[in-house]
């Protein structure tokens, strides 16, 4: 028999509240309750959550810190910020009689938390001391953003606190107003006008209340300590030691040798080694040593030379430096002992503390070995693979515009860290033309990584394509007979031509856009690929407008007092519609003539269509040879030409130029009232000479009428369509020449007995 399980747990009594009917209930305002809760949370900076007392929990009791600081109080007001900086300036000024107002460098320890605790007590502030410290630390790097201080207060703070001046406008203003001088870091080191500046205050001044700041100054490195470390390294290198590989044994010895120095003795050997590796070695080219000593140090430490210092070192020492910055060979010489730093005896003052900082592009010590050509090739293949979309088209990579650190996280073909690959790519992107890729592949790489193109690369690229460059020198488009490089889906509807530059070769330009010698431009481009050319209309249009051969045509066709009518923007087609449906639904105007046809399309106006298979630009006009035939006058009289007025044929909404030219004439057979029509000759047999002469006469007369109608068309267009562009008129003239040439070829085929493909 199954027993019933019972629990010994006693239920807790339920406390019930009974309201008295006679008691008046007050209405509670929820907004006041919420405001009260928020005020209570503001007052409590840290709250300890009480652990649960449930008997079912087996976890030990622990307290959890919950921060309740609100973000609304983190913003400093203008008065608070000015009060903070004026307090710092007063601390830097002398209060001793006879020296009141004189300013000295770094008299206060703004990095000490005790300093900001004292600042909070004196101003009776409500913020945390670290908030005052963070505010000062942030704006000391961009002090030009602090508004409300007088010019004298601002320049004194720049000098006393050694704040770097980061903007050129601020530097120019300080030079004009106070004749200040700067070091290579942008820190003010002296002035001819500010005579109240001192490097440090007199030792007799009372610094009571500021002893806590001196403790911070004792632990900071100065330029003297940097020089001591370099002397020690030179001695060890001369003995054959490796300061980087040996690490702690050498630097522990450095601490023992300088026990009397407070800064060095209070730090461990690991701290000195870390500072030497991160700060001193990358900034070796800034140190005041001779060039040969620096070259030996770069060689022994196996550290690459900064790019801006390579030329100087090569000129003075004759060292062989490879493309990565490493010294391959250095002529033998003796390493001299480094001389101590001597202060400059003038109105300038050297910074008391060391101004060396860790560079942003610091090379990892574990990755200092040279890259092999195979690794460089693997990096380029990875970049090319990542810059191709699903359709196989090269697109720009936004990550690679900067340093691209995250881009190489997926690079698995090497044991190096991705930070090292990133640093190597910064060097490789300047050596694209030295790779084994073809010109087209190099052009794709330049476009994908947004690398500015230099003059040598432009000379090579314009031999295969016409380039459109951005103001920064990067490639926006590259147009050739067989390819288009450039993402054109996000292009604006109207582009400013003066913002771009156009680089092209005249022969490649003619080959790309079609001439009489090359009648089928872009013939190898597929249909879906050619549709992308529609969106680059204005770039190609301005390309053609800059073409040198159009200058003569421009002078001949432009009307002096033509008033250009405002253009209406063409609505963008829907994504669901195909290119042909978008063409049918879009409005057609004379300035944006659209002719979307897979057989014989043409491009003109502001909307670029599929590239033509027939040329529209010809450097030389097509010249017809004079035709000889009998009884030409009688043939002309018998040929009935139906010629409609150009005004009726010119319908800007429905009729294109090609349709106008094809429909503006039609030939009829001679009158059959006097004699029956002659029988038709078979296709294979050549026509009789009399019939051939009659046919040639009709065709020649029809061509003449076509030219006459074309002139009437242009005259009508100039009178009624002032916005007809020069390039369009030139294209229409070229189209007329092509149609004339087609008639000539058809006549030759008739005379030879061949059939004509209509």
Swiss-Prot record:
Q: In which tissues is it expressed?
A: Expressed in some neurons including the head and tail neurons, HSN and VC, in a subset of glial cells, in the distal tips cells and in the intestine.
Query: Its function?
Result: Acts as a non-receptor guanine nucleotide exchange factor which binds to and activates G-protein alpha subunit goa-1.
Protein name, please?
G-protein alpha subunit activating protein gbas-1
Effect of changing residue 660 to A: reported as:
Abolishes binding to goa-1 and ability of gbas-1 to activate goa-1
Record motif GBA, residues: 653-666
Which GO terms are recorded in the biological process aspect for this UniProt protein?
A: small GTPase-mediated signal transduction
Note the subunit structure: Interacts (via GBA motif) with guanine nucleotide-binding protein G(o) subunit alpha goa-1 (in GDP-bound form); the interaction leads to activation of goa-1.
What domain notes does the record hold? The GBA (G-alpha binding and activating) motif mediates binding to the alpha subunits of guanine nucleotide-binding proteins (G proteins).
Name the segments for region: Disordered.
30-70, 668-690
Q: Where is the composition biased (Pro residues)?
A: 676-689
The biased composition feature labelled Acidic residues covers: 30-48
Domain of life (superkingdom): Eukaryota
Give the compositionally biased regions (Low complexity): 49-61
**Keywords, comma-separated and alphabetical:** Guanine-nucleotide releasing factor
Q: Which InterPro entries match?
A: G-alpha_activating_GEF, SPK_dom
**Keyword Cell inner membrane found:** no
GO MF annotations in UniProt = G-protein alpha-subunit binding; guanyl-nucleotide exchange factor activity
């Amino acid at each position: 028999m199954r027993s019933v399980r019972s629990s010994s747990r006693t239920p807790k009594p339920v406390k019930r509240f009974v309201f008295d009917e006679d008691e008046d209930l007050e209405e509670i305002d929820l907004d006041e309750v919420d405001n009260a809760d928020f005020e209570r949370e503001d007052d409590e900076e840290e709250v300890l959550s009480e652990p649960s007392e449930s008997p079912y929990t087996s976890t030990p009791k622990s307290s959890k810190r919950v921060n309740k600081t609100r973000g609304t109080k983190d913003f400093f007001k203008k008065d608070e910020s000015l009060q903070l900086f004026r307090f710092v300036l007063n601390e830097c000024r002398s209060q001793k009689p006879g020296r009141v107002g004189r300013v000295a460098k770094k008299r206060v320890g703004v990095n000490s938390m005790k300093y900001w605790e004292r600042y909070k007590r004196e101003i009776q502030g409500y913020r945390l001391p670290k908030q005052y410290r963070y505010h000062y630390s942030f704006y000391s790097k961009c002090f030009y953003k602090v508004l409300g201080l007088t010019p004298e207060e601002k320049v004194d703070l720049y000098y006393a606190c050694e704040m770097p001046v980061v903007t050129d406008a601020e530097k120019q203003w300080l030079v004009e107003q106070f004749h200040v001088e700067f070091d290579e870091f942008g820190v003010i080191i002296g002035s001819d006008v500010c005579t109240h500046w001192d490097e440090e205050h007199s030792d007799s001044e009372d610094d009571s209340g500021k002893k806590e700041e001196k403790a911070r100054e004792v632990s900071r490195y100065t330029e003297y300590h940097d020089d001591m470390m370099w002397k020690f390294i030179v001695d060890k290198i001369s003995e054959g030691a490796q300061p980087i590989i040996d690490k702690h044994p050498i630097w522990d010895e450095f601490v023992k040798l300088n026990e009397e120095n407070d800064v060095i003795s209070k730090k461990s050997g690991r701290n000195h080694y870390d500072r030497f590796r991160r700060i001193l070695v990358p900034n070796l080219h800034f140190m005041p040593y001779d060039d040969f000593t620096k070259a030996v140090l770069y060689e022994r430490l196996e550290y690459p030379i900064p790019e801006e210092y390579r030329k100087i070192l090569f000129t003075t020492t004759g060292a062989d430096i490879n493309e990565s910055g490493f010294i391959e060979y250095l002529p033998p010489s003796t390493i001299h002992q480094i001389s101590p730093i001597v202060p400059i005896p003038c109105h300038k003052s050297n910074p008391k503390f060391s101004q060396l900082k860790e560079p942003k592009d610091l090379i990892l010590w574990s990755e200092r070995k040279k890259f092999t050509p195979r690794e460089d090739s693997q990096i380029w293949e990875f970049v090319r693979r990542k810059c191709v979309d699903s359709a196989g088209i090269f697109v720009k990579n936004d990550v690679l515009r900067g340093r691209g650190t995250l881009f190489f996280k997926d690079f698995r073909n090497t044991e190096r860290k991705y930070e090292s690959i990133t640093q190597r790519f910064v060097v490789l992107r300047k050596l694209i033309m030295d790779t084994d890729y073809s010109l087209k592949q190099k052009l794709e790489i330049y476009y994908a990584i947004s690398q500015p193109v230099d003059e040598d690369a432009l000379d090579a690229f314009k031999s295969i394509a016409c380039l459109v460059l951005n103001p920064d020198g990067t490639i926006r488009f590259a147009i050739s007979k067989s390819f288009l490089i450039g993402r054109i889906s996000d292009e604006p509807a109207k582009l400013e031509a003066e913002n771009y530059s156009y680089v092209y070769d005249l022969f490649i330009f003619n080959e790309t856009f079609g001439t009489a010698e090359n009648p089928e431009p872009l013939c190898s481009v597929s249909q879906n690929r050619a549709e992308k050319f529609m969106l680059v209309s204005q770039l190609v249009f301005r390309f053609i407008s800059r073409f040198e051969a159009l200058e003569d045509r421009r002078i001949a066709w432009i009307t002096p007092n033509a008033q250009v009518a405002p253009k209406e923007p063409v609505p963008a087609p829907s994504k669901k519609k195909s290119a042909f449906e978008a063409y049918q639904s879009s409005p057609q105007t004379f300035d944006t003539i659209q002719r979307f046809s897979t057989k014989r399309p043409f491009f003109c106006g502001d909307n670029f269509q599929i590239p033509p298979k027939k040329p529209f630009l010809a450097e030389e006009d097509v010249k017809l040879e004079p035709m000889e035939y009998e009884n030409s006058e009688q043939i002309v009289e018998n040929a009935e030409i139906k010629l409609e007025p150009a005004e009726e044929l010119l319908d800007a909404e429905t009729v294109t130029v090609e349709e106008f030219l094809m429909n503006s004439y039609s030939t009829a057979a001679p009158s059959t009232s006097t004699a029956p029509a002659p029988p038709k000759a078979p296709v294979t047999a050549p026509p009789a000479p009399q019939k051939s002469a009659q046919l040639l006469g009709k065709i020649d007369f029809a061509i003449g009428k076509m030219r006459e109608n074309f002139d009437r068309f242009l005259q009508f267009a100039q009178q009624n369509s002032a916005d007809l562009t020069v390039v369009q008129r030139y294209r229409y003239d070229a189209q007329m020449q092509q149609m004339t040439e087609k008639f000539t070829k058809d006549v030759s085929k008739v005379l030879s007995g061949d059939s004509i493909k209509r």
